[in-house]
Each structure stands twice: as C-alpha cells, then as structure tokens.
Curated annotation (Swiss-Prot):
Cellular localisation: Cellular thylakoid membrane
GO molecular function: NADH dehydrogenase (ubiquinone) activity; ubiquinone binding
Transmembrane regions: 6-26, 36-56, 87-107, 115-135, 136-156, 169-189, 210-230, 244-264, 275-295, 312-332, 333-353, 376-396, 419-439, 490-510
Name of the protein in question: NAD(P)H-quinone oxidoreductase chain 4 2
UniProt family annotation: Belongs to the complex I subunit 4 family.
Reactions it catalyzes: a plastoquinone + NADH + (n+1) H(+)(in) = a plastoquinol + NAD(+) + n H(+)(out); a plastoquinone + NADPH + (n+1) H(+)(in) = a plastoquinol + NADP(+) + n H(+)(out)
Keywords assigned by UniProt, alphabetized: Membrane, NAD, NADP, Plastoquinone, Quinone, Thylakoid, Translocase, Transmembrane, Transmembrane helix
Lineage: Bacteria, Bacillati, Cyanobacteriota, Cyanophyceae, Oscillatoriophycideae
Organism listed in the record: Trichodesmium erythraeum (strain IMS101)
Coarse class of the protein's main subcellular location: membrane
Length: 561
C-alpha cells in the first residue's frame, strides 16, 4: 500500500459535497451564478483528480495506493478508509469527467437551479465515494447516498411519467442494496478477532464455501440491479425515458459502472472461491443481456428507450469478461465499462440536444434532420459508430478483448465457449441494425413534422426564435427554427469523442492503468479454481473442464489461506 501525508482522496470526495452545502448562501437571481459555480466545482475536482493520479499513482503497483484511514466508530470497527487501485482509479476519472460535462450540459436549467446543482454536486461526491471506499460499510453508505439525488433529479426535472420512473428506480436499487449491508455484517462478524469492515482484511478471511456462495448470490443481485442485468433491468428504460439528458448521462455513464465495479471488487476479488461456481451463470446472463437488449432496443420507438436497451446489451460484455477466467477477458470487461461510459454519455447528451430542438423523442416523428442540423447529424453518427464497435473506436477494442478472452479461456469446455461466443456474436449483429435504423429515422426519412402547440405564448408570430426545452420547462415557439448545435454543445460532444477515438486507436491509454491489478486478481481467481477442480461441486461440473496445468498457476495459497 502507498500512503501519502496529505488526504488527497478525502479532499476529492468531500469537495463537491462541501461546495454543495454553500449553495444556499450564494446570491443568485437568474440561475447564471449557480451554473458557473457548479461547473467550476466539478472542473476543479476533476482537475485535482488528474493532478493527484498523475503525480502519485503508480500503474505498475497492483496494491492499494493513496491510502487514508481514520477511525470513525472504533466500537464497531467502522472507519473512513479510502484508497485507489487499478480497478477504481479509471472509474474515478470517468465519474469526474462525465459528471462535470453533465453539469455543463445542464446549462438551460431555470427551474429550481439551486436545488438542481446542489443535488448534482452531492451525487458527484457519492459516486467518487463508492469507487474509493476501502471500508465495506463506507461503500454501503455512499451507495445509499447516491440514491437520493438521482431520485429527486428524475422526479423533479423529468418527463411526464417522472415520478413513476423515479419511484421504480428507488425501489429497485434501495431494496437490492440491502444485500451489501447484510454481506458487510456477515463478513465482518465471521470468525474470531476484532470486528472490521476493511476490505483487505475481509478478503483474507477463509469463509466456508456455503457461506461464501450465499454472500456472492446476494451481492450479485445488488450489482445486477445496478448493472441492469436481465431480469433486474426494467427500471433502466423507464428512468432513461423520463430523466433529463444530463441525468441520463450520469445514469448510463457512471451509475451502471458502479454495478460492474462491485462485481469485480467484491464478487470476483474478495469471493473468488464462490466465483468459480457462479462464473458460468455470469457468462449465460451476459449472453442473455446481449441478445435480449439488442432485440428490445430494435423494438423501441422512443429514442432514449432505444439507447437504454442498448446499454443493457453492452453490459452483457462486462459479464462475459468477468466470467472468462482470463487476464484479457477481465481487462476487456473493465475497458468496456470505460468505453461504454463515454459512448453512452455522449449519445444521451446528443439525444437531449435533439429533444431541445424537436420537443419529441418519438423516432417516427423525426426525419430529414440531417439537412437542417448537419453538426448534430455528424456528431450523432460518429457516436453511433462507436457504439456499434466500429474499428478505431473504443468499443471495438473492448468487445474484441472480451471475445478473445472468452474464446481462449482454458477453464470452460470447448462446447460452452463456442456456444457462448456464437450467441454473443448474434447479439452483436443486432447492434448496427437498431443503431443505423435510428439514424435513418432521425436524419434521412421524411417522418412526421413535430407539432408544437402552446397557448398564450408570446412567440406565436416570431419565426426565428429557437426551440428550447429542458425537462418540464419549455419555451417552444409554434413556428420555431430548429438550429444546429451550438459551440458549447459541440465542445461537450468533442470531449467524449476525442477520448473514444483515442482509446480505440491506442487502447493502452486506458489499459495501462489497471493491467497489473487485473493480473493479480485473475491469478487469485485461477488459484481458487485449482482448489475446486479436484472436486467440482454444484452445477460447475457441467460447464467447467479442468485443464489448467499446475505449472501455469502461481502458488499463492499462503496469501489466500
């Protein structure tokens, strides 16, 4: 572990939260001060992350770095313990970038701007807190803290069915998160010695297999809900369909990744013995997500719901990579999380930009937009190409790594690998179908002209006024001219697309941050398999074929046991 004297991570986590508490005392009449304040806080925090990781993070070290630990409630073993490693550091940067740009995207918020930016900054802190928490109870607290601002952001600034969507999101995620609390208490209280929630110490305990399997199942439900794993995904299309564009950017770009992070951090790394038996289940769920998400996406006429089901499909590759038992597959899963975070964020942002002009998300009411909005057309097309894994884009690199990782796995039988890869490839073929179909409906076909009728509007006779709409607060002239993307909107999209193309052309930009950690985690998982392969239990015998040479597995049993 690498420790520093100055509490950098604590500062990064608490800065947005403390800044949010000052919002009620800042004078602001028209909301302009609030938006600059929110953007400034987000940008400063993101810049601080970049500085700290550039100066202090060692990519070749697989252990925890920048460790800070302060006793909070010593009577029950609870402490403020934060750190980063290869699993969390890239996701912290992703959360900082997406949240900062989502604040910049919410430039037109004029309804309760103080509350809006307060919630966005609280959400900022909670997200970072989840990724850097080294104390399992602290992770649970941050996980729960994140639910409140998301619920309010959807229910106040969402669409017509915003309360239904927000309530459904809250019920799903809050109910599932109980398993984190149960697992934390169970792991902390197991065995002799002092009670602790420190993840490092909990990971070193030797749990009975039955107990570990129960823990794994409970956490799989928790993280499966957040990752939108079938059949726990139904909250996602409703939430995206009703949330405003900046909130959808965070939902797809960051919150889904919390589920994938939890699976790797807790299920894969800390409960590796149980992972041996659940890995085939994850692989099957991954294939189901890919095919089911693709088929449902094609059937959606609402643009944001189509993108939401696309996210369900892409998260299937994360499950496949985690289940692969290979360095390449797990690395591809993490790269897929980073890649999808960038791609989904820019797609939902552009969906919001389009909605601002048309005041509709119905694809059959669009058409011919390519001529009147060429910049939006170009940005949308590039983003869609990235989502369908065009070579040279980050999605291609991550999905290829997952495919090769699963194919080259020496744990599964050749039949299981072949069927899994074939079905995933079938699902992959669906991606260009529903994305190119969406582009055709939006930018090429004639469609039906959007009808915008607002009574008592002062703009009825003004032809050149721009159509503006954010959430439930619309100023939409009846004869509005639908303008192309503004410089601010182009800049936001460009920030994402530069990274998407950069990672696609040179994936090492991202993978070098976590390669060492992935090797260490997978070595531990494969070692757990060697303990289990002599006596395959439960359903694993039908899927696993023991063919790991003993010489390939490092002897780390002393560290594990």
């Amino acid at each position: 572990m690498m420790e520093t004297q100055f509490p950098w991570l604590t500062t990064i986590v608490l800065l947005p939260l403390l800044a949010a508490l000052l919002i009620p005392f800042i004078p602001d009449q028209n909301g302009k001060t609030m938006r600059w304040y929110g953007l400034g806080v987000g940008a400063i925090d993101f810049a601080l992350m970049c500085y700290v990781f550039w100066k202090y993070y060692n990519a070749s070290d697989s252990g925890f770095q920048l460790v800070e630990k302060y006793l909070w409630l010593p009577q029950i073993g609870l402490s403020w313990a934060v750190s980063v490693d290869g699993l969390s550091m890239p996701l912290v940067l992703l959360a900082g970038l997406v949240t900062t740009l989502s604040i910049f995207a919410a430039w037109q918020v004029d309804y309760k701007p103080r509350l809006f930016y307060f919630l966005m900054l609280v959400l900022y802190s909670a997200q970072i807190g989840v990724f850097v928490a080294q104390d399992l109870m602290l992770l649970f607290i941050m996980w729960e803290l994140e639910l409140v601002p998301v619920y309010l952001l959807i229910s106040i600034w969402g669409g017509k069915k915003r309360r239904y969507a927000a309530t459904k999101f809250l019920l799903y995620t809050a109910a599932a998160s109980i398993f984190i609390l149960v697992a934390a208490l169970g792991m902390a209280l197991y065995g002799e010695g002092n009670t602790t929630f420190d993840m490092v110490e909990l990971g070193l305990k030797d749990y009975p297999l039955a107990f570990e399997l129960l823990l794994y199942l409970g956490l799989l439900i928790t993280f499966g809900v957040k990752l939108a794993v079938f059949p726990l995904h139904t909250w996602l299309p409703d939430a995206h369909g009703e949330a405003s564009a900046p909130v959808s950017m965070i939902l797809a770009g960051v919150l889904l990744k919390m589920g994938g992070y939890g699976l790797i951090r807790l299920n894969l790394e800390m409960l590796s013995d149980a992972h041996v038996y659940f890995a085939p289940v994850l692989a099957i769920l991954g294939v189901v997500n890919i095919v089911y998400g693709g088929l449902n996406s094609f059937g959606q006429s609402n643009m944001k719901r189509r993108l939401a089901y696309s996210s369900v499909a892409h998260m299937g590759f994360v499950l496949l990579g985690i289940a692969s038992f290979t360095d390449l597959g797990i690395s591809g899963a993490l790269l897929q999380m980073i890649s999808h975070g960038l791609i989904a964020a820019v797609l939902f942002f552009l969906a919001g930009v389009t909605y601002d002009r048309l005041h509709t998300l119905a694809l059959d009411e669009m058409g011919g937009l390519g001529q009147v909005m060429p910049k939006i057309f170009a940005l949308f097309t590039i983003s869609a190409m990235a989502s369908l894994a065009l070579p040279g884009m980050s999605g291609f690199a991550s999905e290829l790594m997952v495919f090769v990782g699963v194919t080259s796995s020496d744990i599964y039988s050749s039949t299981f690998c072949t069927v899994t890869v074939f079905l995933a490839a079938v699902g992959l073929i669906l991606t260009p179908i529903y994305l190119l179909s969406m582009l055709r409906q939006m930018f090429y076909s004639t469609g039906k002209a959007p009808v915008c009728l607002l009574k008592n509007t002062p703009y009825e006779n003004e032809v050149l006024d721009e159509a503006i709409c954010f959430g439930t607060n619309c100023v939409l002239p009846a004869k509005a001219v639908y303008t192309d993307a503004k410089p601010r909107e182009v800049a936001i999209a460009a920030c994402f697309l530069v990274l998407i193309i950069g990672i696609g052309l040179y994936p090492k930009i991202a993978t070098r941050m976590y390669d060492a950690k992935i090797v260490a985690v997978n070595t531990q998982v494969r070692q757990s398999y060697t303990f289990a392969k002599a006596d395959p239990q439960l359903f694993a015998k039908g899927f696993l074929f023991p063919r790991i040479p003993e010489s390939e597995v490092l002897s780390v049993s002393g560290l594990l046991r």
